[in-house]
Amino acid sequence: MGCVQCKDKEATKLTDERDNSLTQSLGYRYGTDPTPQHYPSFTVTTIPNYNNFHATAGQGLTVFGGVNSSSHTGTLRTRGGTGVTLFVALYDYEARTEDDLSFQKGEKFQILNSSEGDWWEARSLTTGGTGYIPSNYVAPVDSIQAEEWYFGKLGRKDAERQLLSFGNPRGTYLIRESETTKGAYSLSIRDWDDMKGDHVKHYKIRKLDNGGYYITTRAQFETLQQLVQHYSERAAGLCCRLVVPCHKGMPRLTDLSVKTKDVWEIPRESLQLIKRLGNGQFGEVWMGTWNGNTKVAIKTLKPGTMSPESFLEEAQIMKKLKHDKLVQLYAVVSEEPIYIVTEYMSKGSLLDFLKDGEGRALKLPNLVDMAAQVARGMAYIERMNYIHRDLRSANILVGNGLICKIADFGLARLIEDNEYTARQGAKFPIKWTAPEAALYGRFTIKSDVWSFGILLTELVTKGRVPYPGMNNREVLEQVERGYRMPCPQDCPISLHELMLNCWKKDPEERPTFEYLQGFLEDYFTATEPQYQPGDNL
């Protein structure tokens, strides 16, 4: 992790600190969970260690690393001598319950109670109304968190994904916390040239001892706002001047309301099934609404699919898993027929998206990026000592902007159907399952890694069924004898080698999801510097 300087005697060029770990050890530079937040706080979550396949659900491990999704946590401290900290709304919000407070972007609030974590009790200084507001929809007045261009704890790859979204012109930019240097920031800009086409350049913003900021020591600023203003007026050595802040999507809420945060068994009557999205072996998936005003996805399970008691126990754990690459569980109806209420993903399953949707036209960079997103979500599950057990494209959901999220984690363990529990029955996903799991029931995070390798083949073949021409029995026999799928057509050899690593016979020889995330995120950029030098900066 050294400072690399371009030595150009003609024109003084400075480079930002480059993260050499890109070329040293792909995947191992990822530390704490990169879920975007404004003000992170760590919690200690008790989740059973499912990677010990002998353990029961009741055996718990205390796992450090679960990141609370709340933007601002704890009791607010006052500012100056006023005794009041004012917050400003960054987005519009429509109240979902009688306890909520509707508001418009730009409204200012006095916070009355911040003890509920993700939901704060507030008074609007615009309307005088009082009620609960989602804490990640507001920021302190005059803070950088309130700026359109500030994206907080956004990872480098997610920054590129957002900046390269359709419709953003050259010069679209954002500022985020640096992943590699504490207290520093990164400026990410959408650029274009004849060689690369549309791409993103990243510049390190350093902090002075006296509190100022700079990209180059020859241009120092008291505030980030002044730095942005300066480079908005002139490129001054950057790839181009800053033109427009990147559009921020609406923040996701991890609960339906403040009331369902802790009491999330809800009445069936509060749900309306509107449009059936899919039909599976064990139930249906619907687009619906909660309370008539909040769009959700509702999975309805056929009676007898699983024990309501076991489901409720597992749901308690699933509700604690909060990550931007996992489909968020909102609420449940635990009496049969069981309803599982989650966030709604507009493009449906990855399998359908690849076979029949917009995914048919995707090129390799998009497909690798989607794989990286899944690996990132699974790396979180890995850190939390949890297991998916049924990882495949049918259980990955797609949203706008090619956002991918993992669904149905943990549910496979609860299914009581004989055609499934036999593990070699007609309903069991043999072609995605590691041999030690299919033959002996040894499900661990390493059997999930095997399944991820199969999912990679689904991506590059646009949803083709694995092991074409072979039935389940033949697959199990051939895999046990050492057979592995050959490299799919038009798939790079390096990607097939990654699949083969996922399919190692010895589970312990398979890579971690942390490694898979790093490898895939840097797949097309491993030979480029992480941070760009500027021209005459």
From Swiss-Prot:
A GO cellular component entry from the record: plasma membrane
Family affiliation: Belongs to the protein kinase superfamily. Tyr protein kinase family. SRC subfamily.
Q: How does it assemble?
A: Associates through its SH3 domain, to the p85 subunit of phosphatidylinositol 3-kinase.
Name the Enzyme Commission number(s) assigned to this protein. Answer: 2.7.10.2
Co-factor requirement: Mn(2+)
**Could you tell me which residues carry Phosphothreonine?**
12
**Post-translational modification Phosphotyrosine, affected residues:** 420, 531
EC supergroup of this enzyme:
transferase
- Catalysed reactions, semicolon-separated: L-tyrosyl-[protein] + ATP = O-phospho-L-tyrosyl-[protein] + ADP + H(+)
Q: Which UniProt keywords apply?
A: ATP-binding, Developmental protein, Kinase, Lipoprotein, Manganese, Metal-binding, Myristate, Nucleotide-binding, Palmitate, Phosphoprotein, Proto-oncogene, SH2 domain, SH3 domain, Transferase, Tyrosine-protein kinase
Give the GO terms filed under biological process for this record. cell differentiation; cell surface receptor protein tyrosine kinase signaling pathway; reelin-mediated signaling pathway; T cell receptor signaling pathway
Specify the protein name.
Tyrosine-protein kinase Fyn
So where does ATP get bound? Answer: 277-285, 299
How is activity regulated here? Answer: Inhibited by phosphorylation of Tyr-531 by leukocyte common antigen and activated by dephosphorylation of this site.
